[in-house]
Structures are given as structure tokens and as C-alpha cells.
């Protein structure tokens, strides 16, 4: 009975560690999705305004 209980505790502990790893991974993924990447001055820009400041439509570059 003691051996069975110990085995169950080990399995539960292992599952708990895996769950914590997945939670940490999901947290990192959310953070990277919230981090916006923008183009700096002089870089080309298009329909999606991906400039840090403003996209000059005539030149199609970031200002």
C-alpha cells in the first residue's frame, strides 16, 4: 500500500511540473504577441502601418 501511494505521489508531482512548464510557455507566448515590432525611420512601409511613427504614403517610408 505504501509503494502504491508513493508511485501516485510521484506521478502527481511530475504532472504538476509539466503543467507549470506549459503555463510558463503560454505566458511567454502572450508576452511576445503583445510586444509590437515597428519599422524605424526610412524603412519601407505599406498598407499596414508598421512604422514606429508615421508612414509617408507618397514615399512609402517611415518618417
UniProtKB/Swiss-Prot annotation:
InterPro entries: Conotoxin. Keywords: Disulfide bond, Ion channel impairing toxin, Knottin, Neurotoxin, Secreted, Signal, Toxin. Residues 14-37 form a propeptide. Expressed by the venom duct. It is found in: Secreted. Disulfide bonds join 38-52, 45-55, 51-62. Residues 1-13 form the signal peptide. One of its GO terms (molecular function) is ion channel inhibitor activity. It comes from the Eukaryota. Coiled coil: none annotated. One of its GO terms (cellular component) is extracellular region. Its main location: secreted. This is Conotoxin Bu9. It comes from Conus bullatus (Bubble cone).
